[in-house]
A protein has these predicted regions:
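Long, compositionally biased interface segments
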Residues: 207-250
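Bacterial N-terminal signal peptides that target proteins for export
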Residues: 1-11
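Solvent-exposed N-terminal domain segments of exported/luminal and surface proteins
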Residues: 27-145
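Short, low-complexity cationic-aromatic patches
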Residues: 95-97, 152-162, 210-223
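Bacterial N-terminal signal peptides
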Residues: 10-20
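Extracellular/lumenal glycan-associated surfaces
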Residues: 103-106, 127-132, 160-173, 220-234
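Short helix-loop boundary/capping segments
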Residues: 144-151, 160-201
Length: 250
């Protein structure tokens, strides 16, 4: 082989190796960003929620805007719907629905915490339609006794800064997918289920002080600790998180 042929061959080989490495790296990046890599139950999130993995965490990114109508949308918005629920004491809160960017990092392999930390005010998890869950207290850290009258026909309402959320059963979801189905996850990585299990309504007496229990579900046939929505205080979550909570930024 001549010197010229050797040089050409060497350059060609280097280019081929470089292209292969670039293709592999590109493929790795693409694979890491696909929803198919997250645990199966997370793939039940709607298209409004972006899914990715960051180390040992599932990352959920959402705007908090519901995929159903509400009197809290502007009256000129196609998503506006006057209140048509069953609460005769309904009184619209002074707020509306604006997009609020949430980035939640949730443990992919949740485990029971040594000590159950209290849930904070504000977002404590995310429903399947990208609307955040809040705990059983209002913005002044008081019971929801009065604020319940401001919940729309799907049981949501906005904060004074226009961040829509659920404190109680998200009726649009339970009516659409069923009362015994997965509704979302709390920040500690444990799932939230509707108010029905085994063909009967769940009551607070069926649950522990954190508002959950261990058991099999359709998404976790081997069993997992899970929270339940009920129709009585504390509605969604009790004395704190069962596991160690991840983080939320907005």
């Amino acid at each position: 082989m001549s010197t010229r042929q050797y040089v050409v061959s060497t350059i060609a080989l280097a280019l081929a190796v470089s292209a292969t490495m670039a293709a592999c790296a590109s493929g790795d990046i693409a694979a890491a960003s696909t929803a198919s890599d997250v645990p199966a139950a997370y793939r039940k999130y709607s298209s409004e929620v972006q899914l990715s993995i960051d180390g040992d965490f599932v990352v959920l990114t959402a705007t908090g805007v519901p995929n159903h109508k509400s009197p809290y949308f502007a009256s000129s918005d196609a998503r506006y719907e006057a209140y048509n629920g069953t609460n005769r004491s309904f009184a619209k809160a002074p707020g509306s629905i604006d997009a609020t960017r949430y980035v939640m990092r949730i443990p992919m392999r949740p485990a029971r915490a040594a000590t159950s930390a209290a849930t904070p005010l504000g977002p404590i998890g995310l429903a399947l339609n990208g609307v955040p869950f809040f705990n059983q207290y209002n913005g002044q850290n008081r019971p929801l006794t009065v604020e319940i009258d401001s919940f729309d026909q799907y049981n949501g309402h906005p904060t004074p800064t226009n961040a829509y959320h659920y404190h109680v059963e998200p009726l649009y979801l339970t009516r659409t997918i069923g009362g015994d189905q997965l509704l979302g996850f709390l920040l500690d990585g444990f799932p939230v289920y509707g108010p029905v299990e085994g063909g009967r309504r769940v009551t607070n007496a069926d649950l522990d002080q954190l508002h959950g229990h261990l058991g099999k579900t359709s998404d976790y046939p081997d069993g997992i600790y899970h929270y339940h929505i009920t129709d009585a205080d504390p509605y969604l979550n009790g004395a704190g998180f069962y596991g160690s909570a991840g983080t939320v930024n907005r």
